[in-house]
A protein has these predicted regions:
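NTP-dependent small-molecule kinase module
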Residues: 48-128
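Tryptophan-centric aromatic hotspots in well-structured domains and transmembrane helices
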Residues: 1-2, 92
Length: 128
């Protein structure tokens, strides 16, 4: 799923994004028989916040080197937008990790993740 998000972020034409995603799903789940996830959770951190956090993290570590995607803000923005699109296209759960421009606490985010998964488990149990 992260590969789908980053690779789709390189494609500008939405119909081509859909075509790529269909191809990748076929490859991973039908051809390679990889297990299909029951749930995907997109931890939504806007690009400006993630870049600020990466910059702060780099300031704390003298020899921190950004990965190839962190070095390219335009790619980060396109990948982020792809993530939001994938939430709509595939029904991924989107959890906002930022409130008023600041990262929410780990505990708050974890509670949202837990409650989302718990709700899915309860729905499954009630339907079986």
């Amino acid at each position: 799923t992260s590969n789908m998000l980053h690779q789709a972020g390189k494609i500008r034409d939405l119909s081509q994004v859909d075509k790529y995603c269909d191809w990748l799903e076929n490859l991973e789940y039908d051809t390679l028989k990889l297990p299909r996830p029951n749930k995907v959770i997109f931890l939504d951190v806007p690009v400006e916040v993630s870049m600020r956090l990466a910059h702060e993290r780099a300031g704390l570590k003298a020899n921190t080197q950004k990965d190839i995607h962190e070095q390219n803000p335009e790619h980060l923005l396109h990948a982020y937008n792809s993530g939001k699109y994938m939430c709509q296209k595939y029904g991924w759960t989107r959890i906002s990790c930022v409130e008023n421009g600041n990262l929410r606490s780990i505990e708050d985010i974890a509670n949202d993740v837990y409650n989302s998964v718990k709700q899915d488990i309860n729905n499954y149990e009630n339907n079986n």
